[in-house]
Amino acid sequence: MKVLGRYKNGNYDVTLLSDGTKIRETEDDEFIPDFAESMDIKLTNHCSLGCPYCHEGSTPEGEHGDILNEKFIDTLHPYQEVAFGGGDVTSHPDLIPFLRRLKERHIIANITVNQYQLYNEKELIQRLVDEQLIYGLGVSLMVLTDEFIETVSQFPNAVIHVINGIVLPEEIEEMAGHNLKLLILGYKELRRGNSFLREHLEQVEKNKAWMKEHLWEYVSKFAVVSFDNLAIEQLDVKNYLSEEEWNEFFMGDDSEFTYYIDMVNRQFAKSSTAPFDERYPLMDSCDDMFEKIRKRKHE
C-alpha cells in the first residue's frame, strides 16, 4: 500500500495511505491536534438535480464560491485533507486550476458527486483521478442500477454515499457482495431536508428503523462501511462495537479534528449541519478558524 504522506500534528503523528486509511500514533493518552486534519468544504451552491432532501438547498441558480482568491487556502498544511462538495462541484469553472494549486502544495483533495454527475462527467472525473488531482471520490446514490455498480467499481477509491432514512433496504441488500465501499450519512434536518421529512416522515422513519435493525447483517459483505457522526448517533453505532473496536475506529467528534467551510456564503462552522447562528465569517487562516471552533466546543 502506497504512503501518500506523513506529518506531525500536535502530540501525534499521522500516516495517510493510498486506499484512504489514516493512522494516528502517539505516546500520550489522547490525541491533541495543533490544526485540523481535514475540512469539509462547499465550493458551489449550483446544481441542476433538485434533490428534494438536499440539506444545502442547491439550485440551478446557485452561486459558485470564489475559490481561487480566498486567503485561507494558502495557509493549509501539507497532507491536510479537504473534501469538496456542493452543489455540483464538477460545474465549477475553476475546479481544475484550483485542484492543481492544491496538488502543488501536497494537499489531499477529495470530491463528492451525485450518481448522475458521475455518469455525465465521467471523463472529467477520470482526468482528475489520472492526474492525481483527487484521491477520494464520493458518489451519492440516487437509484441503484447495475450500471451504477459497474461504473463505481471502475474507480478503486470510490465510496458510495447513502443517507439514513433515504436509502432503501433492497438497495443495501443488492449492493452487498460487490466489494463496494459504503459511507452512511445521517439524515440532515436542514433546508429542503426539513420539508421532505414533513412530507415523508413515515417512510423515512421506516427506512431508519430497518437500517438500525438489519445493517450489521450486511457490514461484512462490503469492502468498507463507514459513518458520519450524525449517522453514528442515529444508528447507535457505538452500542454495536466493543470498547476496543470503538477506540480503534472512531475518528472523533465534529470540530475535534475537522470542521466545515462554506466558500459560497464565506462562512465556517463545526459541521454542515450547524445552526445558522453558529456559523462565522470566513477568516484568512485555516488554523484560526479551527481554533475558534474548538474554543466554542469547550465553552
Language model features with spans:
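N-terminal [4Fe-4S]-dependent radical SAM core
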Residues: M1-I41, W246, E256
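Canonical Radical SAM [4Fe-4S] cluster-binding loop centered on the CxxxCxxC motif
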Residues: D28-L68
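Core AdoMet radical
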Residues: S38, E56-D66, Y79-H92, L102-N120, ...
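Residue-level recognition of short loop/turn positions
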Residues: G50, G86, V264-N265
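Alpha-helical scaffolding segments of alpha/beta enzyme cores, especially the outer helices
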Residues: K71, D94-E104, E123, R127, ...
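A short, Lys/Arg-enriched amphipathic alpha-helix followed by its capping loop at the start of a domain
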Residues: K71-P78
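Radical SAM enzyme [4Fe-4S]-AdoMet core and its adjacent flexible, acidic
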Residues: L133-D284
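Cysteine/selenocysteine-centered motifs that mediate thiol-based redox chemistry or coordinate metal-sulfur cofactors
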Residues: F290-E299
